[in-house]
Amino acid sequence: LTILEPESTPFVSMANKATASGTFFEVQVDDLSTANFDGVNEGEDVTAFDNKAANRARIGNYIQSFRRTFAVSNIAELVDTAGVANEFSASEAKAVRELKRDFEAAVCSAQDRQADSGAGAPYKTRGMFKWLGVGGQPSDVPTFAQNVANDTTGTQTEATFNSVLQELYEANGMPGGQLTLIAGPQLKKEISDFARQAGGAGFAFSVTQPAESKKITLTVNLYEGDFGTVAIVPSVFLNRTSGSSTIDGDAGLLIDPEYVAIHTLQAESNSELENQGGGRRGFCSLIAGLACHMPKAHGFFN
């Protein structure tokens, strides 16, 4: 039995991990006032004071419950199936793999947070693209914390890519200097084209490589620019719509891993339910949400 599907979950893997203690969790954001060097007159008394917490704000997100079910009839478990040693265990393992993909796609989506309001309207966690303002800025994110580094013009060139890095640096100073770009397949290919120069009917490369290996490497997995270093990881779970297999190949999340976290209320678990006569059945579940500590720490392409 062979199952060959995309399963890499780079965003969840690199994000910080935290514990949620309720259905809604919050972080605080603040800013610094603009640099001022007007000076102070000699002998001038201090008569005015600033409230340094005036701009402080709380931004938060809901958890979301994820679940995958599985069941195996009595006969299906008893008969020999080619390539499957245990039908119930195989079904359970498949559900776990699907659950991981569900969560990755949710936190990399543009869905907004939602409180549970009854049947058909469950808790939903805000996805990273929505945190960064795709489809409109979230109402709880103050202006000073909103994302400003992005490009939605289409095909990426080195100039447009560097412009986003410059915007990010100007917004937050790039304190870590180490970014990760989770890139759709088309965006990943466009970045690899940065080393190419247009000429004639095709592209010309200018590379110097040792000939002993008898191979040519034409890929970009680490980009070092004027405004930081970017590790580039491909993904097919960016900006997805729930239940759709459509891949947004041009999408990309430019993430500073220090400023995102997964808050888990219930860790991934598997449960077997009572066999009511028809066969063994069960489910795997996860309850967690995405915290973005500061939207302007990140960028996106779309």
What are these regions (language model features)?
Residues L1-N302:
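Flexible, glycine/threonine- and acidic-rich loop/arm segments that mediate assembly and lattice contacts
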